[in-house]
Amino acid sequence: MMTRRDAITKTVLTSLFAFGAPGLALRSHAQSSSAGPYTLPPLPYPVDALEPYIDAQTMQIHHDKHHANYVTNLNRVLAKSPDISSKPVEELVMNLKEVPDNLRSNVKSNAGGHVNHTLFWSMMKKNGGGQPSGELGKAIDKKFGTYAIFKDMFSTAATRVFGSGWAWLVLDGQELKIESTPNQDSPLMAGKMPLLGIDVWEHAYYLKYQNRRADYVEAFYNVINWDFAADRYKKHMKA
């Protein structure tokens, strides 16, 4: 019988492959063993695809510098523990207790950053936005009342994150919830399935929006990839 953790792992992998984000949990045979097995996945769209809502310069720096640093640092940390580096990165964040004490903090930060960003790129698309339809749309209406109420609650969660972190729409078992996480913590660490997330670290928006986080959050609704979120919801509910 498939456990809840197994179902989450299956949903993470199948949805990423289906929507063009194959870099998560794949190995690069061209890398040396000292560098570790994890690679930076390419963006699933051109760097300027999300203009004017998220500018090309921000996307390039965010992906090529910030996300890349998480991958590089994760490989460096796990070079000290080859047995752990043999696992897909989502398994690492879901099973942090299995990581040695002296590595756990660094693995949590960098594996979390890798997982979160790989998901984040696929949670957005050119000409995105609108409202969710189908099973996810109905579930959002049932849980929150209306899409407008959901949007208000999600925006509040995102704008109220103190310092750096994320806001998420997650499945906790089969219940939809809105929550936030600090730093690069992932809902996967608590056994929850992220369906939608927004990065509210300043590097995600400061070049264009400066200190106007609320404006960035509002702009995000124009690039949401609801197809990706709906696919993850459907697969997880059936798992």
Name the predicted role of every residue range.
Residues 1-16:
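N-terminal secretory signal peptides and thylakoid transit peptides that target proteins
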Residues 23-54:
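C-terminal segment of N-terminal export signals and the immediately downstream linker at the start
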Residues 33-37, 65, 71, 76-86, ...:
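All-alpha RGS (Regulator of G-protein Signaling) helical domain and cognate RGS-like helical scaffolds
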Residues 60, 107-128, 195-212:
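Short, contiguous alpha-helical
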Residues 215-239:
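N-terminal targeting pre-sequences for secretion and organelle import
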